[in-house]
Design a protein with these regions (language model features):
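C-terminal extensions of enzymes
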Residues: 335-401
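Structured beta-strand/loop patches that form or line metal/cofactor-binding pockets in enzymes
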Residues: 1-54, 335-342, 390-401
């Protein structure tokens, strides 16, 4: 029986864990969706995190089961793909396909549809997102983008500095000990010099009482930025901290929707946005947030969710190549986390230079391989309008805290 859609719940054990104040992760938790229409397939991904958008793998799976996909397939069959792509770019995915739901549901469906359209049209990922073409008389942009490196709580500063360079931008995940964090900042600053930005990501772990002394201590140690220092949506307190801290503030968990972006600007709560494809509702909506940041003089980072497993990786990288003025770009660590991946070809980072080059197309440039099969959980047959469980042997799932 042919499948119009096949959903995978990928909870793949990680070779190396990743720890920060909001979560400790030892396995991926992504939903990967394959849509097939008239013999062409596209794959999409989301990576829901309850502490970011309030969504979980279970809630997005349930929302997908409730979402009627008839209009999605009707438009894919009935509208010329180039015209449909232009409508989606102009009006937004949710509007064109009449989909309601959380940001990760929208991301899952949008990335799958964009990948399918890219394959039909022979377009690469950056072209799908409307990336600007070459400007007459301008020098071509460099082929590679530098990426940041993250010092999380599972590795010492000494090992990080010895093994993770060269460094273009360093993010340090905060601990529950501000003195330890300041020591890490001092060690990184001494190693990289003054030309490399250093940011501490507090992941909402500071309080209004501790935020200012913590910020001053990190500033004096050599930090340039602090990311999401206070509980999500602490707009007034963020504005007050920004005025006195002597550090620039980047928002992440507080910045999920266009409404969040507008509030952040009105409250003068930040200097930079952390843009992530899954939490922001897909690459096209993420691009709109980048436009909002530019209009208001706010910097932006292209970030990742920890342990992305497939098309979400290349969607974020495509966004970065469309918006080269990003403060920094995160590449993720799929090469370190997963000896075997569910997609081919696997995403690549040049670890000798810590740079990225664009992924080859069409679409997001990858397909599901045999390693994906055990993670399949639901199928939507062409002959049926309802999802059916997939009966496959399940891999051992390791808890991710």
């Amino acid at each position: 029986m042919a499948e119009a859609a096949l959903l995978h719940r990928v909870r793949q054990p990680m070779h190396a864990r990743f720890d920060h104040p909001a979560a400790r992760r030892a396995a991926s938790d992504s939903l990967v969706l394959r849509l097939t229409c008239e013999g062409v397939s596209g794959i999409g991904e989301c990576a829901p995190r309850t502490y970011v958008t309030g969504e979980s793998g279970e809630s997005v799976l349930a929302a997908l089961r409730r979402t009627p996909l008839e209009r999605v397939f009707a438009l894919l069959r009935g509208e010329p793909p180039a015209e449909l792509l232009e409508r989606v770019r102009r009006e937004g995915f949710a509007t064109v396909f009449e989909i309601t739901g959380g940001n990760n549901l929208l991301c899952l469906l949008e990335t799958a549809v964009l990948d399918l359209l890219g394959r039909r049209l022979g377009l690469g990922a950056a072209e799908l997102l409307g990336g600007a073409g070459p400007v007459a008389g301008a020098a071509p942009p460099p082929a590679a983008l530098p990426v940041s490196q993250v010092l999380d709580l599972s590795i010492t500063a000494e090992e990080f500095l010895a093994t993770r360079g060269p460094f273009h931008f360093v993010k340090i995940k905060a601990s529950d000990d501000i003195l330890r964090d300041a020591r890490s900042v001092r060690a990184v600053r001494a190693h990289v010099g003054d030309g490399v930005p250093v940011m501490v990501d507090a992941n909402m772990s500071w309080t209004e009482a501790t935020a200012l002394p913590h910020a001053w201590r990190l500033r004096d140690a050599g930090a340039d930025y602090v990311e999401e220092p206070l509980p999500k949506g602490s707009w007034a307190a963020l504005g007050a901290l920004r005025r006195r801290a002597g550090l620039k503030i980047m928002l992440d968990e507080s910045l999920c929707t266009p409404e969040d972006a507008r509030t952040a600007v009105e409250a003068r709560a930040c200097d930079a946005f952390n843009i992530r494809v899954a939490k922001n509702g897909g690459p096209l909506r993420a691009a709109r947030l980048i436009g909002h940041a530019r209009r208001h003089g706010i910097a932006f980072q292209i970030g990742v969710q920890v342990a992305e497993v497939g098309p979400l990786i290349n969607a974020g990288r495509a966004l970065a190549f469309c918006h080269r003025d990003a403060l920094t770009v995160e590449a993720g660590q799929s090469d370190r986390f997963f000896p075997e991946m569910i997609v081919s070809p696997r995403p690549v980072v040049d670890r000798r230079a810590n740079t990225l080059v664009p992924a080859p197309g069409p679409g997001f440039g990858m397909s599901l391989n045999d390693a994906a099969e055990p993670w399949a959980v639901l199928a939507l047959p062409e002959e049926s309008g309802s999802w059916q469980p997939v009966d496959t042997p399940r891999p051992t799932v390791h808890a991710s805290l």
